[in-house]
């Protein structure tokens, strides 16, 4: 018996390991793994079904087919364990060794491993410094290669085709050595002196200036050094021995009818063995060279197919014409080993069923069908039955359960009590997609789900299914209850707002309840308290909507007992008074005394959570839900066709619009406007008309005239069902009602362009055939979009998770004072997101001072909560420096201070929180709501583009930023700067709005002036770009030759003439080099200079400029010399929605990007080249930078103008890499955060900036070496920042030169693949490439991230698993250095000292 126990113990001995290394296997190693050579291609004997000896399933090599039984049947039973049968040679042991024991094939001729040959960049060709094409020619026997030239003039590595080879042999005899095939390559690799080569390359790199050469040498040097350091030998990339996979991993399964289903690998192995055996025979027979060569080539091809089918040439196909699945295919892709079996597994103790609504449940409950519960909790029930003495053995308990007697149900109730279960709805897009509930047993077969958690699960009851999982161990139950319980997940981790908010029916009920009705029964009554109101309502003395007055008592919980009570009389309605009964003490009555729309209810829950905590909020939310459902039922709201009221004014509005359109068509016919303009204007008119109709309709729907008690006519909000549903936020929107009762409006074609004939009908009136046909366009595109969108969104989420998965909070505080400045977010002049919302939950990096003094208002390192941001607002501060994940200085991970508040919990983040994954989920989860559409500037969009003035919305003072102004003779100010801004600041010094001031704008107010609301402070011509003079003087036109460089044009309408500069392309050769320019001279004719400089006032004019001054005319400061017409007709696609977010995170270069100034300095134009203009910036220190810009791009700057580094010279979308290089990390952060937020904001999705910053932080993980110093890195190499910093510290300790570096921005896909962990990268994408690279360099995976640990089957180093990992490391250190045991206990920063021994063991 003890023997048996020992045997069982042996089986589950798990090795502790800290890291995983991958490398190349040497032939000896492969032979050591093997239990015998596979010599025959046979698999099993089809008569006896026994494996053939020496075949692919041989029992002698791989082990017995049945447990403890040899093949011939001489030895059976456990007692013969370990005996090797002398008859059939099979060891008597467990059959599962057939999953572990490998075999091998001795190849008759060496074969190149296709991964190292064809996976780009080809390692073999890089190492030998030959082209891949050449190496392939050698390998596949098309040419010979010179291995050792001896004394001949041939060179090592030179290729000789057949004729050349014969000729060389004739000439030199056997002086030289040249071969073909894998032997040749192997010999070359063997004879390569790696160390010498490395030294030579290092010298060459320092000795050359050519960038391409440095790049090439560096690549090779890196590979060579990797081989030297890793202990891999280069000749191991050529296989002499081929390992054979254990047979149970490539099974052969008998089907009915005597056929077999087999793994494709068996076919591939059979081909290899067949060819190998044939080659051996041919070599033994000394067959002619050409036959042997052909056989060798075929062997090479069959090994290629086994390792990676289809990588070279045509893929080998099976009987069904599909390519066979090779070893490489087994591990890559969605169905490969990584993603199918290691990252996602099927789990026991789980079930799934359809969900139905459970409106009577409490928030922490879910209804579990009895049948399901019985099945899921079976082992628990068996145990309980046995302990209770109701069954003697497990078998008896099983019988009891199968009978389903009454005692079983009693036991089930006990087992389930307080044992949480986890519910999950696929797709699990964020962490709220799995939550824990306490099960309540119910009849029926459907799971009941609490309505308030539907938002988090994104569940509806139209046939959705959910899965149930049972946490088994005590720790699992504890975590489920403490961390995953639905009552603990009230806030959304994406934005920190409540996600447990009533929707749909509940909102409708509460809204209906809190409406007012004029002249309702009981209006004007006075009540002593709310109970009296309830009695009046229940006895039908007062209606729900009657306006009444009632005395209420409010309690302030912050005051001591008995002091916080206040009583007052309030005007309200019966419904609102009844609603206020639910308000927990401490919430003012004001919060409920209004129309409860969805927004208001959400606010109410939020305030409740912030003021009164979790428990109160949960109870309150539940009670709100019950009341909402009840009132929605009582209200009897439903939709009828008569609720859709078409406004009477509609016909008149449409007639007006048609009139306007006709007018424009006439203008077009007479040639006054272009086709593009006509189209834009028509679209404009119709979108405007649509708005007007919608407005008229909403007025009709939303208000009605009624008589009040005195008989006067008053307006009140209607009780129209459709309007109430939309207004409350329960269902539908104004846009949908507009289609029902207004007009459908303009439709888009599938390519996104707008059809200019609108649909004037609505659904209530019905569409005619043409209108219906136009509608189908958009509808069909919508459906196609949705399908694509889901897939794209899922892929984006996957990339985001992959790039951020290893980012965990590992420290309390890294102690940095760096951070990023946060200002209110402004769009179109409006403050869209005030400062308080942006800094809430962040930690201050620097002290905040009271404005105008040096008194510290809020000290640094304060976590800004609601009360602090309120204080910030009263101070009127408009910019704050806060800590950010991007500036965090923690080596591995991020510190809690740089992250700030845990949005899903509302307090400072815990150590061990997996913020990377949370960030990825928060950005990816709303992805499906984003549109896929790319908008053309047309319709509604074009109206916002052509602004021509700044109109102030708030009263306040003007502050100008970087604006250069000249004063015109008329007293007006004219802006002559490009990136100027005007801010409007109120009395408290808070910024209310801000606007960009374009070049050439006329300002009517100066810095510090006070302006009123609605005042216009700046105007400009929207469609032209002026050239403005900054000095007064006389005009000289230079190089103006009418008919060659300029032409005179007369305006038909006004009759005035003007000069237009011609495009150099259209000029004759003689005048091509001339550059028309306006010079300003004084009376004597000498050049005037710009104020305060010695730069002459020369204004070069680009092609297309219209000159508005004549030669010798006098001009004053601020006058317009010329105008450049802006091309507004070009419709640029604005990429919107999901593709835009993906582009930003992938850091892609946009089309026609902005050109930024590389250095600060003065602009001048150099000699033009074909199609390009040369722009030169000269710095103050004489540094020059040249930029070639295509002629058709419009340059923003003029000759002699000063530009700052990073300023845009040519407009366009900026390249993120340029922003990083020229303006730094902080500017890049602003750019990406704002651009991403803009997309989400359009869809009304709120995401905290922190999440985007976390992803940017991961995109900036790598740095590029500029100067390697004394480190072993190479110039231009990309290194992980922590690794570089460690190396630099080492250098500084040894008084050597550290490396200089600059940050690089990688797109998320690149960043994921460039991660230090090869396991994580391989499981993401491009598995073959990643594994090839890792094997050659002998990479070691430290298993730091989450993904790697999931793959090796451990707890993840985040959350509660962090303690387990640090404990494991600590024990490890104790084993390694027992003498320093006492000193070592307090070193780790995870605080693992609190974790007991048992805790670590069980976790």
From Swiss-Prot:
CDD domains: RNAP_beta'_C (cd02655), RNAP_beta'_N (cd01609). Gene3D superfamilies: 1.10.132.30, 1.10.150.390, 1.10.1790.20, 1.10.40.90, 2.40.40.20, 2.40.50.100, RNA polymerase II, clamp domain (4.10.860.120), RNA polymerase Rpb1, domain 3 (1.10.274.100). It holds the Pfam family RNA_pol_Rpb1_4. Its cofactor is Mg(2+); Zn(2+). Zn(2+) 2 binds at residues 814, 888, 895, 898. It catalyses: RNA(n) + a ribonucleoside 5'-triphosphate = RNA(n+1) + diphosphate. It comes from the Bacteria. GO terms for molecular function: DNA binding; DNA-directed RNA polymerase activity; magnesium ion binding; zinc ion binding. Binds 1 Mg(2+) ion per subunit. Binds 2 Zn(2+) ions per subunit. Keywords: DNA-directed RNA polymerase, Magnesium, Metal-binding, Nucleotidyltransferase, Transcription, Transferase, Zinc. GO terms for cellular component: DNA-directed RNA polymerase complex. Residues 1379-1388 have a biased composition (Polar residues). Zn(2+) 1 binds at residues 70, 72, 85, 88. Residues 1369-1403 are annotated as: Disordered. Mg(2+) binds at residues 460, 462, 464. Its EC number is 2.7.7.6. GO terms for biological process: DNA-templated transcription. The RNAP catalytic core consists of 2 alpha, 1 beta, 1 beta' and 1 omega subunit. When a sigma factor is associated with the core the holoenzyme is formed, which can initiate transcription. DNA-dependent RNA polymerase catalyzes the transcription of DNA into RNA using the four ribonucleoside triphosphates as substrates. Belongs to the RNA polymerase beta' chain family. This is DNA-directed RNA polymerase subunit beta'. The lineage of its organism: Bacteria, Pseudomonadati, Pseudomonadota, Gammaproteobacteria, Chromatiales.
């Amino acid at each position: 018996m003890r023997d048996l126990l020992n045997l069982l113990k042996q089986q589950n001995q798990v090795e502790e390991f800290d890291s995983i290394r991958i490398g190349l296997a040497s032939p000896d190693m492969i032979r050591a793994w093997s239990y015998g050579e596979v010599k025959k291609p046979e698999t099993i004997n089809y008569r006896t079904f026994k494996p053939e000896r020496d075949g692919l399933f041989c029992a002698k090599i791989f082990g017995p087919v049945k447990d403890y039984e040899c093949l011939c049947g001489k030895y059976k039973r456990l007692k013969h364990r370990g005996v090797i049968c002398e008859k059939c040679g099979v060891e008597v042991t467990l059959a599962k060794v057939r999953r572990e024991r490998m075999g091998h094939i001795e190849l008759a001729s060496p074969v190149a491993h296709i991964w190292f040959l064809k996976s780009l960049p080809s390692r073999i060709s890089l190492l030998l410094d030959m082209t891949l094409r050449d190496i392939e020619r050698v390998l596949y026997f098309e040419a010979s290669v010179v291995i050792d030239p001896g004394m001949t003039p041939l060179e090592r590595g030179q290729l000789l085709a057949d004729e050349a080879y014969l000729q060389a042999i004739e000439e030199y005899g056997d002086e030289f050595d040249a071969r073909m095939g894998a032997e040749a390559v192997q010999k070359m690799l063997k004879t390569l002196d790696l160390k010498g080569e490395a030294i030579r390359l290092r010298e060459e790199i320092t000795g050359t200036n050519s960038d391409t050469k440095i790049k090439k040498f560096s690549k090779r040097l890196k590979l060579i050094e990797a081989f030297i350091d890793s202990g891999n030998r280069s000749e191991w990339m050529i296989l002499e021995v081929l390992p054979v996979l254990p047979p149970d991993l490539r099974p052969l399964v008998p089907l009915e009818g005597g056929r077999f289903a087999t793994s494709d690998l068996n076919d591939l192995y059979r081909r290899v063995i067949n060819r190998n055996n044939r080659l051996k025979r041919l070599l033994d027979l000394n067959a002619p060279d050409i036959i042997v060569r052909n056989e060798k080539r075929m062997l090479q091809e069959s090994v290629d197919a086994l390792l990676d089918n289809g990588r070279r040439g045509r893929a080998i196909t099976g009987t069904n014409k599909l390519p066979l699945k090779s070893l490489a295919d087994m591990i890559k892709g969605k169905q490969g080993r990584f993603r199918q079996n290691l990252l996602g597994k099927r789990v026991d103790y789980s079930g799934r069923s359809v969900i139905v609504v459970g409106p009577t449940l409490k928030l922490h409950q879910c209804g579990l069908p009895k049948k399901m519960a019985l099945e899921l909790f079976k082992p628990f029930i068996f145990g309980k039955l046995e302990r209770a003495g109701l069954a003697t053995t497990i078998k008896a308990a099983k019988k009891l359960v199968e009978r389903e007697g009454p005692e079983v149900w009693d036991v089930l109730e006990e087992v389930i009590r307080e044992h949480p279960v986890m519910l999950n709805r696929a797709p699990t897009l964020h962490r709220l997609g799995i939550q824990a509930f306490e099960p309540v047993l119910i009849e029926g077969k459907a799971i009941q789900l609490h309505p308030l958690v539907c938002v988090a699960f994104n569940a509806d009851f139209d046939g959705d299914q959910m899965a149930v999982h049972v946490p088994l161990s005590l720790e699992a139950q504890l975590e489920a209850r403490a961390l995953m319980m639905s009552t603990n997940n009230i806030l959304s981790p994406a934005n920190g707002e409540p996600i447990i908010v009533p929707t749909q029916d509940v909102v409708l009920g509460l809204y209906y309840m809190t409406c007012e009705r004029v002249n309702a029964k009981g209006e004007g009554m006075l009540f002593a308290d709310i109970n009296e109101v309830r009695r009046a309502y229940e006895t039908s003395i007062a209606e729900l909507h009657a306006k009444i007055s009632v005395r209420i008592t409010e309690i302030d919980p912050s005051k001591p007992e008995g002091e916080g009570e206040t009583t007052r009389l309030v005007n309200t309605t019966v419904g609102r008074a009844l609603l206020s009964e639910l308000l927990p003490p401490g919430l003012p009555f004001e919060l409920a005394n209004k129309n409860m729309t969805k927004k208001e209810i959400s606010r109410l829950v939020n305030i409740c959570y912030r003021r009164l905590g979790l428990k109160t909020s949960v109870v309150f939310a539940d009670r709100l839900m019950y009341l909402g459902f009840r009132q929605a039922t009582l209200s009897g709201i439903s939709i009828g066709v008569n609720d859709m009221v078409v406004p009477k004014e509609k016909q008149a509005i449409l007639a007006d619009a048609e009139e306007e359109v006709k007018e424009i068509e006439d203008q077009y016919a007479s040639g006054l406007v272009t086709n593009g303009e006509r189209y834009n204007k028509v679209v404009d008119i119709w979108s405007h008309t649509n708005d007007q109709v919608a407005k008229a309709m909403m007025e009709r729907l939303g208000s009605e005239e009624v008589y009040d008690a005195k008989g006067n006519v008053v307006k009140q909000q209607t009780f129209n069902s459709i309007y109430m549903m939309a207004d409350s936020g329960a269902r539908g929107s104004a846009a949908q009602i507009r289609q029902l009762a207004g007009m459908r409006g303009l439709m888009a074609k599938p390519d996104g362009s707008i059809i200019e004939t609108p649909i004037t009908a609505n659904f209530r009136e019905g569409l005619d055939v043409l209108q219906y046909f136009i509608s189908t366009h958009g509808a069909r595109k919508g459906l196609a979009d949705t399908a694509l969108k889901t897939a794209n969104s899922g892929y984006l989420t996957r990339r985001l998770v992959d790039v951020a998965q290893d980012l965990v909070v590992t420290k309390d505080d890294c102690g940095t004072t760096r951070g990023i400045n946060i200002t209110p977010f402004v769009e179109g002049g409006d403050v869209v997101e005030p400062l308080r919302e942006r800094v809430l939950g962040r930690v201050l990096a620097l002290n905040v001072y009271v404005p105008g003094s040096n008194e510290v208002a809020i000290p640094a390192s304060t976590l800004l909560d609601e009360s602090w941001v309120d204080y910030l607002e009263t101070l009127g501060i408009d910019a704050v420096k806060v800590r950010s994940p991007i500036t965090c200085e923690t080596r591995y991970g991020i510190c809690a201070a740089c992250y700030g508040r845990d949005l899903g919990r509302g307090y400072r983040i815990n150590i061990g929180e997996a913020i990377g994954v949370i960030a990825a989920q928060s950005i990816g989860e709303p992805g499906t709501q984003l549109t896929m559409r790319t908008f053309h500037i047309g319709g509604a969009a074009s109206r916002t583009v052509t602004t021509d003035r700044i109109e102030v919305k708030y009263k306040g003072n003007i502050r100008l930023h970087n604006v250069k102004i000249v004063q015109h003779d008329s007293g007006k100010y004219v802006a002559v700067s490009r990136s100027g801004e005007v801010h409007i600041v109120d009395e408290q010094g808070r910024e209310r709005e801000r606007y960009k001031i374009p070049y050439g704008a006329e300002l009517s107010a100066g810095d510090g002036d006070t302006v009123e609301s609605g005042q216009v402070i700046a105007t400009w011509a929207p469609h032209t770009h002026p050239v403005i003079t900054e000095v007064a003087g006389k005009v000289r036109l230079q190089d103006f030759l009418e008919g060659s460089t300029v032409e005179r044009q007369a305006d038909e309408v006004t009759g005035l003439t003007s000069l237009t500069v011609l495009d150099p392309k259209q000029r004759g050769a003689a005048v091509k080099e001339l550059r028309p320019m306006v010079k300003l001279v004084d009376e004597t004719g000498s050049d005037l200079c710009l104020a305060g400089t010695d730069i002459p006032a020369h204004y070069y004019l680009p092609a297309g400029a219209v000159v508005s001054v004549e030669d010798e005319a006098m001009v004053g400061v601020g006058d317009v010399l010329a105008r450049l017409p802006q091309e507004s007709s070009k419709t640029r696609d604005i990429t919107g929605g999901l593709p835009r977010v993906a582009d930003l995170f992938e850091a892609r270069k946009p089309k026609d990007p902005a050109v930024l100034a590389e250095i600060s300095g003065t602009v001048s134009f150099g000699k033009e080249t074909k199609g390009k203009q040369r722009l030169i910036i000269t710095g103050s220190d004489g540094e020059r930078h040249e930029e070639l810009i295509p002629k058709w791009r419009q340059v923003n700057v003029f000759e002699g103008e000063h530009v700052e580094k990073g300023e845009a010279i040519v407009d366009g979308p900026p390249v993120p890499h340029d922003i990083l290089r020229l303006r730094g990390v902080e500017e890049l952060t602003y750019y990406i955060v704002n651009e991403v937020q803009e997309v989400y904001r359009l869809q009304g999705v709120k995401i905290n900036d922190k999440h985007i910053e976390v992803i940017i932080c991961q995109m900036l993980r790598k740095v590029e070496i500029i100067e390697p110093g004394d480190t072993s890195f190479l110039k231009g190499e990309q290194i992980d920042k922590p690794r570089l910093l460690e190396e630099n510290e080492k250098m500084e300790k040894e008084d050597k030169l550290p490396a200089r570096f600059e940050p690089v921005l990688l797109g998320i896909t690149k960043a994921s693949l460039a991660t230090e962990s090869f396991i994580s990268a391989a499981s993401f994408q491009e598995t073959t490439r990643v594994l090839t690279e890792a094997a050659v360099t002998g990479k070691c995976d430290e298993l730091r991230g989450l993904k790697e640990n999931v793959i090796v089957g451990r707890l993840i180093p985040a959350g509660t698993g962090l303690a387990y990992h640090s404990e494991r490391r600590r024990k490890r250190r104790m084993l390694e250095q027992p003498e320093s045991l006492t000193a070592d206990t307090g070193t780790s920063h995870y605080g693992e000292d609190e974790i007991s021994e048992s805790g670590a063991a069980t976790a």
